[in-house]
Curated annotation (Swiss-Prot):
Component of the periplasmic nitrate reductase NapAB complex composed of NapA and NapB. Binds 1 [4Fe-4S] cluster. PANTHER family: PERIPLASMIC NITRATE REDUCTASE, RESPIRATORY NITRATE REDUCTASE. Keywords: 4Fe-4S, Electron transport, Iron, Iron-sulfur, Metal-binding, Molybdenum, Nitrate assimilation, Oxidoreductase, Periplasm, Signal, Transport. Pfam families: Molybdop_Fe4S4 (PF04879), Molybdopterin (PF00384), Molydop_binding (PF01568). This is Periplasmic nitrate reductase. Its main location: periplasm. One of its GO terms (biological process) is cellular respiration.
């Protein structure tokens, strides 16, 4: 049989799609597959961002040999971005870790020793010794974990269960604290429930798109392709893009707005004022479904209590608010006039009016998208609340083509970090550790003694750094992230604690990252389809995949590491006598026994797996671990607006958007006819709030924690580029992606470069009050900062831009502001 290249590719795609869907394969496609020595195809969500694209993975002889966009995936419809097309190569970097490595000298652990290969038993021996010593000397507050929005659903659930119920420590937090915490608190304050009410299907039905601090063209390129298609197919569709510098998303914008850093708060209040002044309030919606509250102000910047800015704040960390009347709210936003807004933001008046008109026009369906520009902000929660105000004033919410939409940056920042309760203050399904009723629900469901879960909120990400430095946190397990490179203020607040001889730091990772090389023990980790997994994307879509290949060498999944390490602790070693007295039958049992081998978790047999299906963890334990953990976790949300489908349904589908009730997913929450929790005749119901009403908040402009001055005369903003994902620990090991963008550069306005005698390609030292880094001047290209601002990506381990950043956070969400600090430049 002869086939052209075109026919070959087409037949191959058909074979892949059919195999993954469990369908019969046409004869010509079967022949092609046969010629390829039976490549096996299966579905998986992409390993990278929070979009949640579906891919088809081709494996042969124990390796991934091909990958392509899944034509049946509703998110991406067969398309991949540049990173997605190179997914197989992230698995096969030359420096992939294959065995545990401990710092040793003269055959013993030594903080200053060289990394030496050891066995898993030896690794767990050292970890056990360190954990038990700290627990005995200082108690649960001396241990901690920093996890990930890249954990699978059951990995995050197992980690939260092990720390909060097993070790009785709430000192567990995910790296989603650095990217999505402000979105979470914003959702909770306004709606009483986390995560977006809309979905990606809004794109094809919207009349206008407004991007707030979001470069979707590079950070969510597949969604951007759908927006581009919508914009170019209808001349009446509008796109507005707001940022502190021009980037690739501006190329499509009808209204591209560059504003002074932090002044987005002013623009948001101006639009609310415009809506009111032009009688554009949806009075019927507003009167039935909205409450008004005035927020507490002057809340500080999440810095150490001894910092002058914290000392000066009148209400540091306060999230209090009080009811207010409409007239009071009207008077509050009336201060944000067009003239004042233009002056404070640097945005021309006509551009501001054009933007406000999109929201005010009752005939325009508007979607607001935002990512890190909003969230990584010392008033990120306020920014989230203020954009909700615009949609609540106009009623443009919870309907096809209308709504506010917080985009996530990690593949399971929603499905894992947020939903299963891996934040230091959270429990599954939006429950929190400070609520006695919520703790009781968890303790009863987990069949552990009452009072096991601590009521005190644990250490969040930045607080963990500070506690390590201060010697209060002494054993620290970092999983599935590279926080030494990604977190703020490396020199002053992170590195000192990691290298403090009082502390022991473990890093679980597939590669020797900056974090791994700063640790004391490195555990080699299985990644992506080397394990069975589940992610939850930005539109509430939960997606499963099967294990498709084995991990190299002795690399083990995060789930295996957590569950097996739990065997090292008996209940009497971690729980006080008063707890054991409640359930004496738990004496002598290990944390593995009481958390992971319970009847509820272990009841699903291996026969639920196909005979030839890989699943290393379950086959080692003798029961279907992932299914047991998922079903135990899913119980928390069922009947409470977070309903997940039965486990097996997800392996058959291309993901389902919760709540899933009676087998049907939900596209638009809170509205009648779309959401099963909204009854006939209710219209809208924001059922996260006791009265079913959302909240409009009155919140003012407050300045950034640090701004340029005479000495440090430039704003610095950090972020990503299309070719690399986060710290580049995966993408920089893909030769094609590395060649496309080999090193970080400093994007700067040509006039700012000229006044400093700098030219494109020159080496330049970037200096802040905390550190310095040498980069390369770039006056052209994709990012075009205004005068007074420079932009630098953080993917390059040789240019640690977070040596420069300030560890100021939003005081409510504890999320770091990576977008605003002051720097100066010196020619090298």
């Amino acid at each position: 049989m002869k086939l052209s290249r075109r026919s070959f590719m087409k037949a191959n795609a058909v074979a892949a799609a059919a195999a993954a869907a469990g369908l019969s394969v046409p004869g010509v496609a079967r022949a092609v597959v046969g010629q390829q020595e039976a490549i096996k195809w299966d579905k998986a969500p992409c390993r990278f961002c929070g979009t949640g694209c579906g891919v088809l993975v081709g494996t042969q002889q124990g390796r991934i040999v091909a990958c392509q966009g899944d034509p049946d995936a509703p998110v991406n419809r067969g398309l991949n971005c540049i990173k997605g097309y190179f997914l197989p190569k992230i698995m096969y970097g030359k420096d992939r870790l294959t065995q545990p490595m401990l710092r040793m000298k003269d055959g013993q652990y030594n903080k200053e020793g060289e990394f030496t290969p050891i066995s898993w038993d030896q690794a767990f021996d050292v970890m056990e010794e360190k954990f038990k010593a700290s627990l005995k000397e200082k108690g649960p507050e001396a241990i901690g974990m920093f996890g990930s929005g890249q954990w699978t659903v059951w990995e995050g659930y197992a980690a939260a269960k092990l720390f909060k119920a097993g070790f009785r420590s709430n000192n567990i937090d995910p790296n989603a604290r650095h990217c999505m915490a402000s979105a979470v608190v914003g959702f909770m304050r306004t709606f009483g429930m986390d995560e977006p009410m809309g979905c990606y299907d809004d794109i094809e039905q919207a009349d206008a798109f407004v991007l707030w601090g979001s470069n979707m063209a590079e950070m969510h390129p597949i969604l951007w392709s759908r927006i581009t298609n919508r914009r170019l197919s209808d001349p009446n569709v509008n796109v507005a893009v707001l940022s502190t510098f021009q980037h690739r998303s501006f190329e499509l914008a009808d209204n591209g707005i560059v504003f002074t850093p932090q002044s987005d708060l002013v623009i948001l209040n101006y639009i609310a004022n415009y809506i009111i002044q032009n009688n554009a309030i949806n009075q019927d919606f507003f009167s039935k479904y909205v409450n008004l509250r005035k927020g507490t102000t002057d809340i500080g910047y999440g810095l150490r209590p001894t910092h002058p800015l914290e000392k000066a704040a009148k209400n540091p960390g306060s999230d209090a608010s009080e009811p207010m009347s409409f007239d009071e709210y009207k008077a509050f936003v009336a201060e944000y006039t067009l003239e004042k807004t233009a002056e404070m933001t640097g945005v021309p008046k006509d551009q501001l009016e054009q933007l406000a008109q999109l929201y005010a026009d009752p005939k325009k369906k508007v979607i607001s998208y935002w990512t890190m520009g909003f969230n990584q902000h010392t008033r990120g929660v306020w920014a989230n609340n203020l954009v909700y105000n615009l949609h609540l004033l106009t009623g443009k919410i919870s309907q096809p083509g209308c709504g506010p939409f917080s985009l996530t940056g990690q593949p399971s920042a929603c499905g894992t970090a947020r939903e299963v309760g891996t934040f230091s203050h959270r429990l599954p399904a939006d429950m929190v550790v400070t609520n006695e009723k919520h703790r009781d629900i968890c303790e009863k469901h987990w069949q552990i003694p009452t009072g096991t879960i601590p009521a005190k909120i644990g250490l969040h990400a930045v607080a963990q750094d500070r506690a390590l430095k201060d010697g209060k946190l002494n054993v620290y397990w970092v999983m599935c992230n590279n926080n030494m490179q990604a977190g703020p203020n490396i020199n002053e607040e992170r590195m000192p604690g990691w290298r403090d001889p009082r502390n022991f730091v473990i890093v679980s990772d597939p590669y020797p990252t900056v974090s791994a090389l700063a640790a004391d023990l490195i555990l080699p980790t299985a990644m992506w389809v080397e394990k069975e997994g589940a992610y939850g994307n930005a539109e509430r879509r939960t997606q499963f995949w099967r294990q498709q290949i084995k991990a190299p060498g002795e690399a083990k999944s995060d789930l295996w590491q957590l569950v097996q390490f739990a065997r090292r602790f008996k209940t009497e070693e971690v729980w006080p006598e008063d707890l054991l007295a409640q359930k004496p039958e738990l004496r002598g049992k290990t944390l593995y026994d009481v958390l992971f081998a319970t009847p509820a978790v272990s009841k699903f047999p291996l026969t639920d797996l196909a005979e030839d299906q890989l699943n290393d963890e379950s086959r080692e334990l003798g029961f279907y671990l992932q299914k047991g953990l998922f079903e135990e976790y899913a119980w928390f949300g069922r009947g409470h607006g977070h309903d997940l489908a039965p486990f097996d349904d997800y392996h058959k589908a291309r993901g389902l958007r919760w709540p899933v009730v009676d087998g049907k997913e939900t596209q638009w929450r809170y509205s009648e006819g779309h959401d099963p929790y909204v009854k006939a005749g209710e219209g809208y119901k924001f059922y996260g709030k006791p009265d079913g009403k959302a909240v409009i908040f009155a919140l003012p402009f407050e300045p950034a924690a640090e701004a340029p001055d005479k000495e440090y005369d430039l704003w610095l903003s950090t972020g990503r580029v299309l070719e690399h994902w986060h710290t580049g620990s995966m993408t920089r090991r893909v030769p094609e992606l590395h060649r496309a963008f080999p090193e970080a550069v400093l994007f700067i306005h040509p006039l700012d470069a000229k006044t400093r005698d700098l030219r494109r390609g020159d080496k330049v030292k970037v200096i802040s009050r905390r550190g310095e880094v040498i980069s390369v001047v770039e006056t052209r290209g994709r990012n075009r900062p205004p005068q007074g601002l420079v932009y630098m990506p953080f993917f390059d381990a040789a240019q640690l831009v977070n040596n420069l950043t300030l560890d100021a956070t939003d005081p409510l969400s504890k999320e770091t502001d990576f977008k605003k600090c002051a720097v100066k430049l010196a020619k090298v």
